[in-house]
Amino acid sequence: MSDIEEGTPTNNGQQKERRKIEIKFIENKTRRHVTFSKRKHGIMKKAFELSVLTGTQVLLLVVSETGLVYTFSTPKFEPIVTQQEGRNLIQACLNAPDDEEEDEEEDGDDDDDDDDDGNDMQRQQPQQQQPQQQQQVLNAHANSLGHLNQDQVPAGALKQEVKSQLLGGANPNQNSMIQQQQHHTQNSQPQQQQQQQPQQQMSQQQMSQHPRPQQGIPHPQQSQPQQQQQQQQQLQQQQQQQQQQPLTGIHQPHQQAFANAASPYLNAEQNAAYQQYFQEPQQGQY
């Protein structure tokens, strides 16, 4: 737009053309303030003239660059600029953001929302993939164990199968030999126990028939386990010898029956006591 003023006649009868002014923002701050003060005064004067000439109600608000408010109002509009409510409304309108700023803020909010939506989508995808992977692993495991569940394999067979796999396909003949040896050892143990029981009973009877003096001779239960075994063996040998020899009316002395009484497991005092005991005749006890 351009501001064109009408020409005025001169003394020579020629009209002088007025200069044209381009309407745009003034970059110079000093010139901007001067223009504001002049134009403000002129527009206030025009508003007053308009209200007087036409009898209309006029309200004019002019706000400076520094935030000062200049007003012109007819009597009916005076409460708007004089009362506190009107001033607060004017201040609220001045504090409101411009349309351009609002548009920029809305665009920025939309961009942020889009970014948030994209991040949420990216987060949901890995979370959805994890349950799918877990389900696949479970299905594969169930398929691998399906034939075991259908056949109802016992726990012992399953353990043997695992052991055979760990051994790396060992020879089945060796496994059968090992099982036979285990079975043989298990059967031989009860037989040994049955053989030992009569021997122990016989040894106890022999000891009861031949009492020993309590002085100088330790009790069999107080000796070591090795000594007890040695004595039991000696008693068994003596019993066998007695069974082999013919029975006669004359009893032989105990020195012959207990030829090995001086055991290497006894000390010197015990050996002396044994020799003294066996050298004495024991015929009166029978």
From Swiss-Prot:
Domain of life: Eukaryota
CDD domains, sorted: MADS_SRF_like
Keyword annotations: Acetylation, Activator, Arginine metabolism, Cell cycle, DNA-binding, Nucleus, Phosphoprotein, Transcription, Transcription regulation
Source organism (scientific name): Saccharomyces cerevisiae (strain ATCC 204508 / S288c)
Modified residues (N-acetylserine): S2
Compositional bias per record (Low complexity), positions renumbered to this chain: 122-136, 171-246
GO biological process: arginine metabolic process; G2/M transition of mitotic cell cycle; negative regulation of arginine catabolic process; negative regulation of transcription by RNA polymerase II; positive regulation of arginine biosynthetic process; positive regulation of transcription by RNA polymerase II; regulation of arginine metabolic process; regulation of mating type switching
High-level lineage: Eukaryota, Fungi, Dikarya, Ascomycota, Saccharomycotina
Quaternary structure, from the entry: Homodimer. Binds DNA with a high specificity in complex with mating-type protein ALPHA1. Also binds DNA with a high specificity as a heterotetramer consisting of an ALPHA2 dimer and an MCM1 dimer. Interacts with YHP1 and YOX1, possibly leading to its inactivation. Interacts with ARG80 and ARG82.
GO cellular component term, pick one: RNA polymerase II transcription regulator complex
Compositionally biased intervals (Acidic residues): 97-119
Chain's role: Transcription factor required for the efficient replication of minichromosomes and the transcriptional regulation of early cell cycle genes. Activates transcription of ECB-dependent genes during the G1/M phase. Genes that contain a ECB (early cell box) element in their transcription regulatory region are transcribed only during G1/M phases. Interacts with the alpha-2 repressor or with the alpha-1 activator thereby regulating the expression of mating-type-specific genes. With ARG80, ARG81 and ARG82, coordinates the expression of arginine anabolic and catabolic genes in response to arginine.
Entry-annotated residues carrying Phosphoserine: S2, S144
Coiled coil: none
PANTHER family: SERUM RESPONSE FACTOR HOMOLOG (PTHR48019)
Ranges where the record places region Disordered: 97-137, 167-264
Signal peptide: none
Record's protein name: Pheromone receptor transcription factor
Phosphoprotein keyword on record: yes
Span of domain MADS-box: 18-72
